[in-house]
Structure formats: structure tokens, C-alpha cells
């Protein structure tokens, strides 16, 4: 039986001399107590040495992934196939690949593991020609290379540098503010007008460092820092200043403070450039989405880029506003809509009405960019630029929607225009060019009004006729009551009908055409009454 043993120096193939002793697994370690005993159990048949660490790294990465290296394939074809013996391997997965590709029988068992442990303990005595110092150096180099490969370590992707840089930048800003405030107050006793004329802090300190006492402003040239107009104003103010006189020692201490301010300002500029470059190297997509400072503060708040990538979009949105969040939860009020992400340019340029909506969308896209930067192999910022363009388009739509609501053009723009085919021939309407008086719409309305007046007059005439007839009938009915002592039921009904007709108002729109005409029976009765009277 042959044994494949991998070392940091090369591949070793051993021949098992006494296979009977392999049956006793528990006592096999006793056979490898000394190099002499080990040489009685196994014997080196072939040793394939690596040329350098790169070759060793390629071989071991292939072994870890369960693949056969070209160099190993050559050794197995040359040595093992000719021997026609089974091959003992430490990895069962590797044995399956060797059996599949080279058609060699492989063995993997607890006995093989114990045999490998014994060979490893006496490796220096079993492999001649390899010095212990060389073996140790190769082991150390291969260990570093393997760990770097497995962790996919990159010197550029060290987010610890970002955490420290942004913290130092914040500290420098605080120190600069304190120093500049102290410098302005201190020198303000001597020349108070200078602080009102020069608003820039760095320019103020540079002018102060160059001139010192206000008496020297008349002869000093400040064209390096100030424009001609401001320089003339400073010189004029120095002549009529209301400040007190100070000693040379005071001026000296103020100048030392100005030197500190200038040096810290220059270092801050250098540190900001370093932070920009480091952010573009580690998280280019996050930098495009929210900027260098906001991205660095998010990473610093989470601790690292990997920790930040594990957060949800809703967490990233309110990251940095934990105090306000827990205060709102405790008092049962509305929770904050944004934290550190509020300082991003996309949220800053939005109107207050849409800040919450944009911060939510920006947090969702920023989380995608963070995960792409943390786990992706590509180092380009194309994905971040594409997502930022989408957010800007969405922001424009939201802003336009608000403008349309104010102007009232939203419904007009929402209506689809009528489709007109290009082949349609459009004719010119000449009616607009005519200067002759035409019938206006007002005249048509007047004609309609006249017709309405005519119909109303006819309706009134019909009403008057109906009323006259009803009155005549009422008089006739009264006369009949006088003549006849007992009126019949039919006459009462007729009277009721006549009263009902008198009470009902007739509509003006539909004039009543059916008039109450007396029946022929009534006419006969009237004639009889007249004859009786005669």
C-alpha cells in the first residue's frame, strides 16, 4: 500500500513495509516513537518538491477545494499507476476525485489517519534532504499565504483606518473651533474691527501671524490673503481702532496660537483627502450614494463595513438617532425618520415635506451599496451611480407633483392627448380672419329669451280663461242650490272637483290646454231654467 502525504515543501509518497502492524490501531503510535522504528514501518518512495511559496499555495488551495493539481496528477500517473497498489489519502473527497479521474483505488479509514499522524511526528527523519530550518520557513510562508487567501485579505480594504480617520477629523474640528474662538477673543481686545472685516478663520490667523501688532498694518502687504478693497478697509480700521494696547509678550502668545491653528487646518485638509481616497478604495458605491463623511460616520457607528452590511435598511435610516428613538418609544410619540443619513446631499436638497420619504428610499439603496462593497469582488462604483440617478429622478417627480398641485395643472397634464395620424390633412379655419360683424352668441340667447316670453304670455292667457270659466261655474252652482232644496250627491262631488281645480296652481312651464268645458246636459238645464223664468 502507498501513502500520499502532503507537506509545505512538497508531495511525499511512502511505501508501507509491514501492513500487519496497521491492524492494531491503538498501539500504532508506539511504532513511530523513534525515526528508526518509523523507517521499519514506512519508506519514502518519491518526493516532489515545490519550487516556491506560490506553487505551494496553488497546490494547497486545490487540495482544500478537493481538486487535483497538475503537478500531483503527474506524480500519481508516474508512481502510483506503475505500482498497481491502493493509495491511502487523508481526505476522502480527494480520494473520490483521484478515483474518478485517474481510476486509482483510494483508501481512507481511521487506520490511515493514525498512520498519517505517525508520519507527521517523524517527518524530519523520514524525508531526507530537507533541512528543519527550510521546512519551518516554508510552513510559515504557506500559513500566511493560505490565511490571506482564505480571508481574501486586501491591504486597501481596512475599514479600521476609516473609523479612526473620521473620529480624528471630528476631534480636529472641535479643537479648531475652540482655538479660533480663543484667538478672536484674545486679539479682539487689541484690534476688534479685524474680526468683523475678515470672516474666514484661516485668513484671519494668517493675517495676524504676518502682521502682529495693529501698528504694522499700515506698512504691511496683505495681497496674498486679501483683495485690494478688503486690505484698504483693514488698514483704515487699524488707524482708528478702539482696541487697547497690549505688550509684546501677549502678541507673541497670540502668534503661537495662530501658528497652531494654521498647522491643524493644513493637517485637517490632508486628513480629509486621505479619508476620501480610503473611502473610494473600500466603499466606492456608498461614497457615491451618501458622500465620504456620511459613509465614514455610518461605518464608524457600526464598527466595521461588515457589521454595517448586516443591518437592515430601516436600521441604517435611523442610525445615529438612538437617543431620540428610545425617547419617542418611551413617551409613545412619533419615532425619528432619519439619523446620520440626514446629512447626505440628497436629503439636504429635498423640501421638508419629502425628507422622510427620500431618506427611506436612500437608506434602502445605501444598504444595497454597502453589501455590494462588503461582499462583492468588483471595486467599481457603477451600481452606486445608477441607484443615485434613480433616486434623483424620483426626487424630481415628487417635487414636480407638488408644483402641479399648487399651480393646478396636474389634471391637465394627466389627460392623454388625442391621437392624430400624421397622414391627416389639417384645414385652416378662415372664420377668425373675418372683420365683418357676425351674429354673436348673445343675440341667439336673446332670441331664446323672446320665445320664452311668448310662451309665458300664452300660459298666462290660458290661466285667465280657466279662472273665468271656473268662476262662472261657481255662480251657476250657487243658483242651482237656491232653486233646488236638496242637492244631489253628484253635485257635491262636482263642487269638490271645482274647488280642487281652483286650489291647484298651474305650472308655468307646461300651460294647461284642457279647459273645464260644461257638458251638454248642463246646457240643456240652463235652457230649461231660462224658459221657466220667461
Curated annotation (Swiss-Prot):
Covalent cross-link site, Glycyl lysine isopeptide (Lys-Gly) (interchain with G-Cter in SUMO1): 467
GO MF assignments: ATPase binding; snoRNA binding; TFIID-class transcription factor complex binding
BP-aspect Gene Ontology terms: ribosomal small subunit biogenesis; snoRNA localization
Covalent cross-link Glycyl lysine isopeptide (Lys-Gly) (interchain with G-Cter in SUMO2) as placed by the record, residue numbers: 157, 353, 411, 415, 422, 426, 441, 444, 465, 467, 490, 502
Positions of modified residues (Phosphoserine): 109, 304, 351, 507, 519
Residues annotated as domain Nop: 282-400
PTM characteristics: Sumoylation is essential for high-affinity binding to snoRNAs.
Residues that bear Phosphothreonine: 34
Keyword Cell division: no
Biased composition (Acidic residues): 470-486
Chain intervals for the UniProt region annotation (Disordered): 470-534
Entry keyword Metal-binding: no
Compositional bias segments (type: Basic residues): 490-500, 522-534
Primary localisation category: nucleus
Subcellular localization(s) per the UniProt record: Nucleus, Nucleolus; Nucleus, Nucleoplasm
Protein keywords: Isopeptide bond, Nucleus, Phosphoprotein, Ribonucleoprotein, Ribosome biogenesis, Ubl conjugation
Alphabetical list of SUPFAM superfamilies matching this protein: Nop domain (SSF89124)
One Pfam family in the UniProt entry: Nop
Gene Ontology cellular-component annotations: box C/D methylation guide snoRNP complex; Cajal body; cytosol; fibrillar center; nucleolus; pre-snoRNP complex; small-subunit processome; sno(s)RNA-containing ribonucleoprotein complex
Superkingdom field: Eukaryota
PANTHER family: NUCLEOLAR PROTEIN 5 NUCLEOLAR PROTEIN NOP5 NOP58, NUCLEOLAR PROTEIN 58
UniProt function note: Required for the biogenesis of box C/D snoRNAs such as U3, U8 and U14 snoRNAs. Part of the small subunit (SSU) processome, first precursor of the small eukaryotic ribosomal subunit. During the assembly of the SSU processome in the nucleolus, many ribosome biogenesis factors, an RNA chaperone and ribosomal proteins associate with the nascent pre-rRNA and work in concert to generate RNA folding, modifications, rearrangements and cleavage as well as targeted degradation of pre-ribosomal RNA by the RNA exosome.
Subunit-level organization: Core component of box C/D small nucleolar ribonucleoprotein (snoRNP) particles; the core proteins SNU13, NOP56, NOP58 and FBL or FBLL1 assemble stepwise onto the snoRNA. Interacts with NOLC1/Nopp140. Interacts with NOPCHAP1, NUFIP1, RUVBL1 and RUVBL2; NOPCHAP1 bridges the association of NOP58 with RUVBL1:RUVBL2 and NUFIP1. Interacts with PIH1D1. Part of the small subunit (SSU) processome, composed of more than 70 proteins and the RNA chaperone small nucleolar RNA (snoRNA) U3.
Family membership noted in the UniProt record: Belongs to the NOP5/NOP56 family.
Name recorded for this polypeptide: Nucleolar protein 58
The organism of origin for this protein: Rattus norvegicus
Amino acid at each position: 500500500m502507498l501513502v500520499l502525504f502532503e507537506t509545505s515543501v512538497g508531495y511525499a509518497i511512502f511505501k508501507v513495509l509491514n501492513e500487519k502492524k496497521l491492524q492494531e490501531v491503538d498501539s500504532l503510535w508506539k511504532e513511530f516513537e523513534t525515526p528508526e522504528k518509523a523507517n521499519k514501518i514506512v519508506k519514502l518512495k518519491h518526493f516532489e518538491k515545490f519550487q516556491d511559496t506560490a506553487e505551494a499555495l496553488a497546490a494547497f488551495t486545490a487540495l482544500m477545494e478537493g481538486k487535483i493539481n497538475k503537478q500531483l496528477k503527474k506524480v500519481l500517473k508516474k508512481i502510483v499507476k506503475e505500482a498497481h497498489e491502493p493509495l491511502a489519502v487523508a481526505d476522502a473527497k480527494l480520494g473520490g476525485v483521484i478515483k474518478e479521474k485517474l481510476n486509482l483505488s483510494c483508501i481512507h479509514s481511521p487506520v490511515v489517519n493514525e498512520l498519517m499522524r505517525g508520519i507527521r511526528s517523524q517527518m524530519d527523519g523520514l524525508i531526507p534532504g530537507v533541512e528543519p530550518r527550510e521546512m519551518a520557513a516554508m510552513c510559515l510562508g504557506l500559513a500566511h499565504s493560505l490565511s490571506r487567501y482564505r480571508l481574501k485579505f486586501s491591504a486597501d480594504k481596512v475599514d479600521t483606518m476609516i473609523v479612526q480617520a473620521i473620529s480624528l477629523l471630528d476631534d480636529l474640528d472641535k479643537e479648531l473651533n475652540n482655538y479660533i474662538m480663543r484667538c478672536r477673543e484674545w486679539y479682539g481686545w487689541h484690534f476688534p474691527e479685524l474680526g468683523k472685516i475678515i470672516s474666514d478663520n484661516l485668513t484671519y490667523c494668517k493675517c495676524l501671524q504676518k502682521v502682529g501688532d495693529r501698528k504694522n498694518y499700515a506698512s504691511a502687504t496683505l495681497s496674498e490673503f486679501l483683495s485690494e478693497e478688503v486690505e484698504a478697509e483693514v488698514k483704515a480700521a487699524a488707524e482708528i481702532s478702539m482696541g487697547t494696547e497690549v505688550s509684546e509678550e501677549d502678541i507673541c502668545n497670540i502668534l503661537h496660537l495662530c501658528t497652531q491653528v494654521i498647522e491643524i487646518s493644513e493637517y485637517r485638509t490632508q486628513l480629509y483627502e486621505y479619508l476620501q481616497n480610503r473611502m473610494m478604495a473600500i466603499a466606492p458605491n456608498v461614497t457615491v450614494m451618501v458622500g465620504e463623511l456620511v459613509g465614514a460616520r455610518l461605518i464608524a457607528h457600526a464598527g466595521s463595513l461588515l457589521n454595517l452590511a448586516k443591518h437592515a435598511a430601516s436600521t441604517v435610516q435611523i442610525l445615529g438617532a438612538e437617543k431620540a428613538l428610545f425617547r419617542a418609544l418611551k413617551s409613545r410619540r412619533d419615532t425619528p425618520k432619519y439619523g446620520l443619513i440626514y446629512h447626505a446631499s440628497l436629503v439636504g436638497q429635498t423640501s421638508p415635506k419629502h425628507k422622510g420619504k427620500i431618506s427611506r428610499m436612500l437608506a434602502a439603496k445605501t444598504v444595497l451599496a454597502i453589501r455590494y462593497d462588503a461582499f462583492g469582488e468588483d471595486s467599481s462604483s457603477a451600481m452606486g451611480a445608477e441607484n443615485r440617478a434613480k433616486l434623483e429622478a424620483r426626487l424630481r417627480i415628487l417635487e414636480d407633483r407638488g408644483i402641479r398641485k399648487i399651480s393646478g395643472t396636474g389634471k391637465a397634464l394627466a389627460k392623454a392627448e388625442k391621437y392624430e395620424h400624421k397622414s391627416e390633412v389639417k384645414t385652416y379655419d378662415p372664420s377668425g380672419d373675418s372683420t365683418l360683424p357676425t351674429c354673436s352668441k348673445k343675440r341667439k340667447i336673446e332670441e331664446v329669451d323672446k320665445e320664452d316670453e311668448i310662451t309665458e304670455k300664452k300660459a298666462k292667457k290660458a290661466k285667465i280663461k280657466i279662472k273665468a270659466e271656473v268662476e262662472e261655474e261657481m255662480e251657476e252652482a250657487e243658483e242651482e242650490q237656491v232653486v233646488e232644496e236638496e242637492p244631489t250627491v253628484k253635485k257635491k262631488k262636482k263642487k269638490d272637483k271645482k274647488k280642487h281645480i281652483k286650489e291647484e296652481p298651474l305650472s308655468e312651464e307646461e300651460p294647461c290646454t284642457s279647459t273645464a268645458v260644461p257638458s251638454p246636459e248642463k246646457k240643456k238645464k240652463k235652457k230649461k231654467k231660462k224658459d221657466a223664468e220667461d
